């Protein structure tokens, strides 16, 4: 068998039906939409309309809200930081802050701060100046001789 002899199995592919291309095609004129009514018109139907039945979004109770003042943090794993150190993208001679993480390509868009998570292993002694870290991440950092400095204003 050669590459030019490769074929799909019989019945594996179907030809698509072109709608509204004459009565001989089987899907001409009304194009599978029936006759008259809202659903036969262009623009099809209304989203969430259930034919007069009380729609699901009105049957279910309202819940929760979006807090406009909630602070969101960039979450960075220790393993990701170690990869950047190994690749030479992150300089650990100085303390690591948001600007250093952004320059290394670890975070893209800065949110309200950076939070370290404990995924992966950290082998390098690093001093962090960031918004926060999980308890396990703190213990892992302190275990290798590093430290975390969290600003008072947060």
UniProtKB/Swiss-Prot annotation:
It holds the Pfam family Ribosomal_L27A. SUPFAM superfamilies: Ribosomal proteins L15p and L18e. Residues 1-44 are annotated as: Disordered. Residues 1-13 have a biased composition (Basic and acidic residues). Gene3D superfamilies: 3.100.10.10. The keyword Ligase does not apply. One of its GO terms (biological process) is translation. GO terms for molecular function: rRNA binding; structural constituent of ribosome. One of its GO terms (cellular component) is cytosolic large ribosomal subunit. Residues 21-35 have a biased composition (Gly residues). Keywords: Ribonucleoprotein, Ribosomal protein, RNA-binding, rRNA-binding. The keyword RNA-binding applies. InterPro entries: Ribosomal_uL15 (IPR030878), Ribosomal_uL15/eL18 (IPR021131), Ribosomal_uL15/eL18_sf (IPR036227), Ribosomal_uL15_bac-type (IPR005749), Ribosomal_uL15_CS (IPR001196). PROSITE patterns: RIBOSOMAL_L15 (PS00475). Belongs to the universal ribosomal protein uL15 family. Binds to the 23S rRNA. Part of the 50S ribosomal subunit. This is Large ribosomal subunit protein uL15. The lineage of its organism: Bacteria, Pseudomonadati, Pseudomonadota, Alphaproteobacteria, Hyphomicrobiales. The gene is rplO.
